[in-house]
């Protein structure tokens, strides 16, 4: 099994760029920068895309330009055009249930109330069996404060932790392609930014 599409979830526009909900896109932006593959807007895929080669594998990068709750439109369009199966997709998203400084790989599962994941599952024919990179952003402690929290900007100290976890996740993505998912997962899951 190889990953052929890596997606970073976000809301579009400058006003959302630095918000916690865009943590998935920060990861794809970093990968694109590391692999010297600048993202370009591609309207037919409703997002910014790029093509990279990782260990000889052809991989597409995607940051949807739809709002978060319509992310499946972009993922579905690209998956269908390139005939990419759900288990060949890695979706990076912000995760309330992990603290800043932690990121984890996961295959399948529910959407946990994340509207981006919910729409992707829906547009992939109700198939939740794609890989996820869960980027920890922490939780406000009260479910009524979640919307304001994910659409807020983290303080500098938290931003550094999130950035460090994303940096490690990008390194572990390369490990995944070189040495397999188990090795990449073990390394990433042992990491906690200080």
Curated annotation (Swiss-Prot):
One of its GO terms (cellular component) is cytoplasm. GO terms for molecular function: peptidyl-tRNA hydrolase activity; tRNA binding. It catalyses: an N-acyl-L-alpha-aminoacyl-tRNA + H2O = an N-acyl-L-amino acid + a tRNA + H(+). It is found in: Cytoplasm. Pfam families: Pept_tRNA_hydro. TRNA binds at residues 16, 67, 69, 115. It comes from the Bacteria. Its EC number is 3.1.1.29. The record marks 94 as: Stabilizes the basic form of H active site to accept a proton. Hydrolyzes ribosome-free peptidyl-tRNAs (with 1 or more amino acids incorporated), which drop off the ribosome during protein synthesis, or as a result of ribosome stalling. Belongs to the PTH family. Monomer. This is Peptidyl-tRNA hydrolase. It comes from Citrobacter koseri (strain ATCC BAA-895 / CDC 4225-83 / SGSC4696). The lineage of its organism: Bacteria, Pseudomonadati, Pseudomonadota, Gammaproteobacteria, Enterobacterales.
């Amino acid at each position: 099994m190889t990953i052929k599409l890596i997606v970073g979830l976000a809301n579009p526009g400058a006003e959302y760029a630095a918000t916690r909900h865009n943590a998935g896109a920060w990861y794809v932006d970093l990968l694109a920068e590391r692999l010297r593959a600048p993202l370009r807007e591609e309207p037919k895929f409703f997002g910014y895309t790029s093509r990279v080669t990782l260990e000889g594998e052809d991989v597409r990068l995607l940051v949807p330009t739809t709002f978060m709750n319509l992310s499946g439109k972009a993922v579905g369009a690209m998956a269908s055009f390139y005939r990419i199966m759900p288990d060949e997709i890695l979706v990076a998203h912000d995760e309330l249930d992990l603290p800043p400084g932690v990121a984890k790989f996961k295959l399948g599962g529910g959407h946990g109330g994340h509207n981006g994941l919910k729409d992707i599952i829906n547009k992939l024919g109700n198939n939740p069996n794609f890989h996820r990179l869960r980027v920890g952003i922490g939780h406000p402690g009260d479910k009524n404060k979640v919307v304001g929290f994910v659409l807020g900007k983290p303080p500098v100290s938290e931003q550094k932790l999130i950035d460090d976890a994303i940096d490690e996740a990008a390194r572990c993505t390369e490990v995944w392609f070189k040495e397999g998912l188990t090795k990449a997962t073990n390394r990433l899951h042992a990491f906690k930014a200080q």
